[in-house]
Amino acid sequence: MPGKSSLEWHRHYRDRREELEDFWGRRASAPNLRARYRVFGASVSMASNHECAAAAFELSHPQFSQVPGNADDLPGYELQFAVDPGRETTDVPDDLSTHMRRFGGGDWLLIDAGIWGSAHIDLRARTAHFILSPALARRPDLISSCMNTVILNLFIGSAGAGMLHASCLLKEGGERMLLMMAPHNTGKSTTALRLVQAGYRLLTDSMVFVRETSAGTQLLGFPVGRIKLRADVRREVVAANAAIEEWLEPEEVRSETKHSLDLRRYRPECVQSEAVLVPPCVDLCLLERTGKLETTLRPALAQTVMEAVVANSLYCDRDEVWLPNLELLSRLVEGADCFHLAAGTDVASLVGVIEGMGERP
């Protein structure tokens, strides 16, 4: 009878399934470790066949602003890691990021780390699949910095959060916020460190995410409390305070070795770890370095600021992602007091000019 035959084949398949050739490596890559995290309040599910994924997440997770409670109304993300034991390679170089290539088409992205691994991302499904060599599995720090955090930031933007490439600092009990935008290597991080030393709290020195919540416009940072200094600035900072040198760690950034200062470890009281709502007073500065002694300030048009946002914060992506995000950023800019800040070399002048912005009516 047809029904009986069907049942026999089902039984035969179940009995022989584990003997079938693992042509696609599904059996070898099947996860046996699972964990769940919260990133900006959204759920992130992690599955892996190797403990390196959990180790990488322990490095990635604290770099995102904490959000009180759970944002279960936000879409969740899934990341699956598979270490291929047959893909043994040479050791992974510390400057792995300079060896990586990125490709994109539609909702699919690929991060290619050559012989050491790759990550395939489906933005619409909010999933990422990592294939790693054992050598890369031994470097959870590089998995975190070159893959994990990059992909999580992509998902956050695709979920509707606008992003500014800016430093964000707070003062006066959080009632005053300073945002500083500048191209790479033009003094933004140096200025941020000087303001931290003058009593400001740092949310982030790199990426400020903006999203609307029922309580108001929320700002979140990545990486939280971390400042990256050029080699010449490092020498200047260490000359002024030798004790800071032990807290500086070399890090490859855009084919350049910078020195990262994690304020969460060095001076945790100077870090704004939790996400914040936009306060009543927001100063947004387009920063430039002049080499002169004195710092000067002049008003900036919101249109000029938005042009800088497009130039410094965006990369080629789909219009359906960027246009709503830019609308969010535009509302933030229009509600801020905008300036051109020409940062001088005299610290007292710099701090004095910035403090003066908060004394206006």
What is the predicted function of each stretch?
Residues 1-184, 193, 197-201, 208-361:
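A noncatalytic interaction/capping subdomain that flanks phosphate/NTP-handling catalytic cores
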Residues 188:
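Conserved lysine of the Walker
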